[in-house]
Amino acid sequence: MKTKFTKKTVLKFFGILFAILLLSVLILFSVVIGRTFTFKVNRELGQWENTSTIYPYLSPEQREKLLDNFKVAVQIPTVSFSESDQNITALQEFDLLLRRVFPKVFSSSLVRHEVVGNYSHLFTVVGADAGLEPYMLLAHIDVVPANEAGGWDAPPFSAQEIDGFIYGRGTIDNKQSVMGILQALEYLLERGYTPRRTFYIGLGHDEEINGEEGAVKIVNLLKSRGVKLLYVLDEGLTIMDGVVDGLNEPAALIGVSEKGQTTVKLSVSTPPGHSSMPPRESSIGILASAVARLEKNRMPNLFGHGPERATFEHLAHKFGWSYRMIMSNLWLFSSLLSSVLEGQPDTNAFVRTTTAVTMFNSGVKINVMPAHAEAFVNFRIHSSQTVQGVLNRIESTVSDKRVKVEFINGFDPLPIGSYEDDTFGYQIIKKSVQDIFPQVTVTPGICVANTDSRHYTQLSPDIYRFAPSWYKPGDSARFHGVNERISIQNYEEIVLFYFQLMQNSDVRNLPTLRS
């Protein structure tokens, strides 16, 4: 017996279906709107134990002195050209500078100073309570080269002051941290400070060339002594202001991990010959096609598989309404946000393993077919991938037996440090930021560059990468580029940040969440 569908039955069916769909849309809309106005993961802790007994204040004389000290540090060209080529004279001069301008640090009975690897420095600041687990602050003395003829507004090692900014190589990478940490400790010791919790300061001299003689040797020394660290703070991310569309306030991004990296060499060898009788495909052409495939077929967008999602969720309540709705509902709008992020080079680096062809070499004469062509490609690896996984994908993308793929070096992404409400290091850094920058929202982030802290993973599970330098539109070109600079006010803020961090780290326990 056949079922007969009347017009009335069909209309009733579609009416019910439409009602169900409408109800589903209304429920979905209600959930989205509700989360938009209530979603907030950046929660506050309750009453802190007061260990900041020395007020973060700088007298006019201290402000003048710290600026003079910083300028001299920038003027010393501690350049790392390569692993076999460093300015040793400058590193020796920098050692003498530290001893001269920080007399309390070098003479205090609370501070033990050691030179490691000839030019790096390890300071142990002994706390009164040996039962409290120590922490460590990192920075690096060396800088990348700077070409004085490259368009600088002031010579790169002049530390010249222009419109309230100090110009020079190392002002934001990373002498502001080197001098800021020691200047803060100097002022605390001058005011009678005795730490409760032991802490270490590690200043590497070869971070820009992988840190094998500096950071690695400091780590090995601490390991030999059985040292375990509660947390580690190194350079890395910054205070971003005006560089994220829709974000109404500045945000301090604390790097809870950093990307891995690997470099591969692609090479092609073919018989040489005269250019008057060229083969159908040259070594250059074959290699160029392989490189083009790598650039065209990018690594997958992995937004949400690393800490980058938490960055936006922690900032959601600081965006304007439309952006806030998206950030508060990434369970629904994740693909939308990820597609927007991959549209710009600076944000694309947060959502995937990046592919950068950095060197291409071939040819010896214009009328000779080259027998060999080679290219080097650098990959910065997303938190959810590995070196081996990237290598496998390179092989499948190149997919040409004539192209030899050779692994040069690399390492996996770093472990993700905790940023939970009960994580000591993250919360101490967060409080210290808010003490000095009350207008700033703190959020976890991913560091796309590499730092000395990657060598410290055996000493602590919680490693953070942050220095409170302001990062504004146009500043990305200053990192390792032309017109590197820092404002005088910002350098003073950096000194006060470390001043507070050292005192805040003396709390025995974190407070509970504010109800």
From Swiss-Prot:
The active site is at D142, E207. One of its GO terms (cellular component) is extracellular space. Pathway: Amino-acid metabolism; Energy metabolism; electron transfer; Lipid metabolism; fatty acid metabolism. InterPro entries: Bact_exopeptidase_dim_dom, Pept_M20A, Peptidase_M20, Peptidase_M20_dimer. GO terms for molecular function: aminoacylase activity; hydrolase activity, acting on carbon-nitrogen (but not peptide) bonds, in linear amides; lyase activity; metal ion binding; peptidase activity. The keyword Glycoprotein applies. Its cofactor is Zn(2+). Glycans are attached at N50, N87, N118. Zn(2+) 2 binds at H140, D173, D234. It is found in: Secreted. It catalyses: an N-acyl-L-amino acid + H2O = an L-alpha-amino acid + a carboxylate; an N-acyl-aromatic L-alpha-amino acid + H2O = an aromatic L-alpha-amino acid + a carboxylate; N-(5Z,8Z,11Z,14Z)-eicosatetraenoyl-glycine + H2O = (5Z,8Z,11Z,14Z)-eicosatetraenoate + glycine; N-hexadecanoyl-L-phenylalanine + H2O = hexadecanoate + L-phenylalanine. Belongs to the peptidase M20A family. This is N-fatty-acyl-amino acid synthase/hydrolase PM20D1.1. The lineage of its organism: Eukaryota, Metazoa, Chordata, Craniata, Vertebrata. The gene is pm20d1.1.
